[in-house]
Design a protein with these regions (language model features):
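Conserved ABC transporter NBD signature motif
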Residues: 14-24
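ABC ATPase NBD coupling module
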Residues: 25-42, 68
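Conserved ABC ATPase "signature" region
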Residues: 24, 76-95
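Conserved small/polar residues in nucleotide/adenosyl-binding loops
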Residues: 2, 6-15, 170-171
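Helical segment within the ABC ATPase nucleotide-binding domain
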Residues: 140-154
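Hydrophobic anchor residue at the start of the ABC signature
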Residues: 62, 114, 125, 138, ...
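A short, proline-enriched helix->beta-strand linker immediately N-terminal to the Walker B motif
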Residues: 119-123
C-alpha cells in the first residue's frame, strides 16, 4: 500500500498520511511528490523486466532521473550511470550502458534497478521484493549489495518482503 502511494497509484488510502521529512506525501502537489520520489526516495521494484523500458538503453534509463530533475547534463548523467553500474557490480559498464534490458540476466537487471534507485543519492531506499525470482546465490549477492550501498550512500532502507529466508539473512 505504501509502495503504491509512492509510485502515484490511485489505490492509495487517502484518509491516512505518509510523512517524509516533514511533508505529507498524500497531500503534496504531484510535482512535489514526483520530485521527492525522484530525488529523496529511491525504489527498487520487484520485477526489473517489467519495470525497465525495453526500448531504452540501460545508460539512458539509469541516468534518466538526473536529467528529469535537471541535476546533470546528458553527458554527466551518462558518466554517472557508468560509475554507478560499476558500483553495483556490473561487468564492463561501458558496454552495458548501450545494452537493452532483454540482453541482461535477471540478476544484472536487478543491479540496474538498484543503480536507478540510487542515482540521485536518496536518503531513503525502498526495496520491494528485490530478490523475487532470483536464484539463492543471486539473492544473497543482491542483499549484500544493498547492505554495502546503504552504508556507502548513507541511506536508510525499507525491505518489503515475504521471504523469511531473506529477512533472516539480511543486515538491512
Amino acid at each position: 500500500e505504501i509502495s503504491a502511494c509512492l509510485v502515484g497509484s490511485e489505490m492509495c488510502i487517502r484518509d491516512r498520511s505518509i510523512v517524509f521529512n516533514g511533508r505529507d506525501l498524500t497531500s503534496s502537489p504531484p510535482d512535489e511528490t514526483r520530485r521527492i520520489r525522484g530525488m529523496d526516495i529511491g525504489m527498487i521494484f520487484q520485477d526489473p523486466l517489467t519495470s525497465l523500458n525495453p526500448t531504452m538503453k540501460i545508460g539512458n534509463q539509469v541516468g534518466e532521473a538526473l536529467r528529469i530533475h535537471k541535476v546533470a547534463s546528458k553527458k554527466k548523467a551518462w558518466e554517472r550511470s557508468i560509475d554507478l553500474l560499476r558500483k553495483v557490480g556490473m561487468p564492463r559498464p561501458e558496454k552495458i550502458v548501450n545494452d537493452y534490458p532483454h540482453q541482461l540476466s535477471g540478476g544484472m537487471r536487478q543491479r540496474v534497478m538498484i543503480a536507478m534507485a540510487l542515482i540521485c543519492s536518496p536518503s531513503l531506499l525502498i526495496a520491494d521484493e528485490p530478490t523475487t525470482a532470483l536464484d539463492v546465490t543471486t539473492q544473497r549477492q543482491i542483499l549484500d549489495l544493498i547492505d554495502d550501498l546503504k552504508k556507502e550512500f548513507n541511506t536508510a532502507v525499507i525491505l518489503v518482503t515475504h521471504d523469511l529466508g531473506a529477512v533472516s539473512y539480511t543486515h538491512l
